[in-house]
Amino acid sequence: MSKDYEVFPLLLEMAKRGCLVAPRRLSRIEILKTLGLTPWRFKKLVEAAEEEGYIERRVHGRMVFYVVTERGRALLRRVYDDLKRTIDSSTFLTLRGYVVPGLGEGAIYMGIPRYVEAFKEVLGYEPYPGTLNIKLVDEDVYLRRALREKRVGFRIEGFRLDEGRESCGVTVYKAMIMANGVTVSGAALDIDKTKHGDEILELIAPVRLRDELRLKDGDKVEVVIPV
């Protein structure tokens, strides 16, 4: 496999210059400049690619033509698929944690009509009046902090309550919440002012998550957030 990735840049450059379609003459000087190769290194890579069956050299008099074989095309496709899979998976952030008892803060927010209306506007549904709390594994606490920097959530600003107190703002991240082989569409909350540390993530959904996901304290939960 290491040899595959050594010859891949050369193979890709040949493909870009038409060698996937038909045998082509190539400017060695241009390829050396593009790939930053020495003549000796270029010679070794061509030999390696030919030995592995990725390219063929066809000599006509003093002219040399190169063509990428079906085996070479398969290598290009394999690397492309690896890159696409890696890039596509990077459009989601997965946070892992374990169910812990809550402090009742979520129920307070869910009981304030203005918050409920804001959640309905952002999420398209009225959340169950309460949150599920999970304690993130250590490495995912840092991912949560990185999530804030991406600014991909929906912002609900704080406002003044009837009794004169100020409510705090909250950022809402749409999410898929998964546990015990069940997936529920919900959201993760990042509340501006909370008694919890960054290791505690509060989740909401249109249903009671403990019931829908058959959860008890200590159960593992995964939260997948588009970024």
Curated annotation (Swiss-Prot):
Where is FMN bound in this sequence?
T194, E202
UniProt EC number: 2.7.1.161
Binding note for cofactor: Binds 1 Mg(2+) ion per subunit.
Which co-factor is required? Mg(2+)
Which chemical reaction does it catalyze? riboflavin + CTP = CDP + FMN + H(+)
- Known InterPro entries for this protein? RibK_CTP-dep, Riboflavin_kinase_CTP-dep, Riboflavin_kinase_dom_sf, WH-like_DNA-bd_sf, WH_DNA-bd_sf
GO terms (molecular function) for this protein are: metal ion binding; nucleotide binding; riboflavin kinase activity
Where is CDP annotated to bind? G102, L103, G104, E105, G106, A107, V207, R208, L209, R210
Per UniProt, the enzyme's principal EC class comes to transferase
Provide this UniProt record's keywords sorted from A to Z: Flavoprotein, FMN, Kinase, Magnesium, Metal-binding, Nucleotide-binding, Transferase
Segments carrying the region annotation (Riboflavin kinase) are 93-227
Gene Ontology BP annotations = FMN biosynthetic process; riboflavin biosynthetic process
Q: Which annotated residues bind Mg(2+)? A: T131, N133
Its UniProt pathway annotation is: Cofactor biosynthesis; FMN biosynthesis; FMN from riboflavin (CTP route): step 1/1
**Sequence segments annotated as region (H-T-H motif-like):** 1-92
Q: Which Pfam families match?
A: CTP-dep_RFKase
In the record, the note on similarity to other proteins reads:
Belongs to the archaeal riboflavin kinase family.
The job of this chain, per UniProt, is described as: Catalyzes the CTP-dependent phosphorylation of riboflavin (vitamin B2) to form flavin mononucleotide (FMN).
User: What's the name of the protein?
Assistant: Riboflavin kinase
What is the source species? Thermofilum pendens (strain DSM 2475 / Hrk 5)
Upper classification of the source organism reads: Archaea, Thermoproteota, Thermoprotei, Thermofilales, Thermofilaceae
Q: Which gene encodes it?
A: ribK
